[in-house]
UniProtKB/Swiss-Prot annotation:
InterPro entries: ELA. It is found in: Secreted; Secreted, Extracellular space. Keywords: Angiogenesis, Developmental protein, Differentiation, Gastrulation, Hormone, Secreted, Signal. The lineage of its organism: Eukaryota, Metazoa, Chordata, Craniata, Vertebrata. This is Apelin receptor early endogenous ligand. Disruption phenotype: Zinc-finger-nuclease (ZFN)- or TALEN-mediated apela gene inactivation induces embryonic lethality due to heart dysgenesis around 6 days post-fertilization (dpf). Mutant embryos show cardiac dysplasia ranging from a rudimentary heart to no heart. Embryos have minimal blood circulation, with an excess of erythrocytes accumulating at the intermediate cell mass (ICM). Larvae display variable posterior truncations and, at times, tailbud duplications. Posterior tissue defects range from loss of the ventral fin to complete tail and trunk truncations. The gene is apela. Expressed ubiquitously during late blastula and gastrula stages and becomes restricted to the lateral mesoderm, endoderm, and anterior and posterior notochord after gastrulation. Residues 1-22 form the signal peptide.
């Protein structure tokens, strides 16, 4: 039982490091939205408009 405890901690630390490095490079967001097309200013939502738009409703 004492043998598996350090391996579990090492696996947990490695998982956290991979998630942090993927978040820094921005691959996590792209990986989750591969099938969606990015619309204006790289936003995956359909009804998203830029802030400088004059139209009050999309």
């Amino acid at each position: 039982m004492r043998f598996f405890h350090p391996l579990y901690l090492l696996l947990l630390l490695l998982t956290v490091l991979v998630l942090i490095s993927a978040d820094k490079h921005g691959t996590k967001h792209d990986f989750l939205n591969l099938r969606r097309k990015y619309r204006r200013h790289n936003c995956p939502k359909k009804r998203c408009l830029p802030l400088h738009s004059r139209v009050p409703f999309p």
